[in-house]
Swiss-Prot record:
<dbReference type="InterPro" id="IPR042203">
    <property type="entry name" value="Leu/Phe-tRNA_Trfase_C"/>
</dbReference>
<dbReference type="InterPro" id="IPR004616">
    <property type="entry name" value="Leu/Phe-tRNA_Trfase"/>
</dbReference>
<comment type="function">
    <text>Functions in the N-end rule pathway of protein degradation where it conjugates Leu, Phe and, less efficiently, Met from aminoacyl-tRNAs to the N-termini of proteins containing an N-terminal arginine or lysine.</text>
</comment>
<keyword id="KW-0963">Cytoplasm</keyword>
<dbReference type="InterPro" id="IPR042221">
    <property type="entry name" value="Leu/Phe-tRNA_Trfase_N"/>
</dbReference>
<dbReference type="GO" id="GO:0005737">
    <property type="term" value="C:cytoplasm"/>
</dbReference>
<dbReference type="Pfam" id="PF03588">
    <property type="entry name" value="Leu_Phe_trans"/>
</dbReference>
<dbReference type="InterPro" id="IPR016181">
    <property type="entry name" value="Acyl_CoA_acyltransferase"/>
</dbReference>
<dbReference type="GO" id="GO:0008914">
    <property type="term" value="F:leucyl-tRNA--protein transferase activity"/>
</dbReference>
<protein>
    <recommendedName>
        <fullName>Leucyl/phenylalanyl-tRNA--protein transferase</fullName>
        <ecNumber>2.3.2.6</ecNumber>
    </recommendedName>
</protein>
<dbReference type="GO" id="GO:0030163">
    <property type="term" value="P:protein catabolic process"/>
</dbReference>
<keyword id="KW-0012">Acyltransferase</keyword>
<comment type="similarity">
    <text>Belongs to the L/F-transferase family.</text>
</comment>
<keyword id="KW-0808">Transferase</keyword>
Amino acid sequence: MRIPLLAPDNYAFPDPAYALARCDGLVGVSGDLDAGRLLEAYRNGVFPWFSRDGWFFWYAVGPRAVVFPDRLHIPRSLAKTLRNGSYRVAVNGCFAEVVAHCAAAARPNQDGTWIAPEFQTAYLKLHEMGYAHSFECHYPDESGETRLAGGFYGVQIGRVFYGESMFALQPDASKIAFACAVPFLADLGVELIDCQQDTEHMRRFGSELLPFADFAERLRMLNAVPLKEEIGRREVACKGL
């Protein structure tokens, strides 16, 4: 199979439909992970999956798992934990720390992490540009001091939030962060959350599968529409419990 090599001076991607037709979803390979290439990738439903020997591999997945914020489902056991209220959720309080924890988290059936140092640097750049955001769940420890317990990060373009990775140091911490983040993002105007892959974890939150063509059309429309206000850095209240 011939793998498309992406030009260093051109951020355009081949049509993901061709990669999906081959079943593997590999759209192309690049020698860089520039912010401009990352943003162009997300706008087209493409994301970097891993790197090898200095090359970055870009994929598209279809059908695409997504969460529509107005259809968010909170599992009963998690709703009970949320009502307990012993946690605190914030956005963009410690982005670099969240990414580092995601990189260090053990994953089933994975040897190591795809979030290599080059990826961490790239997403930190997107964070500095106002595109990448982290949601953090904090719990009090035995001394009563509040500490980071879990969270996730992703990229926001227009009214789409592209989820990337989660971690949890305490049970349910990443789930709490997600359950609070979705209504918060919806209030700001986010209409679609990209989960990339279909997993049991996201199905519990009501994720749905979209044909890639439908997903890509939604991106085309929603990426161009700005949020009602910037995500910023603040506390996030859990709503609708």
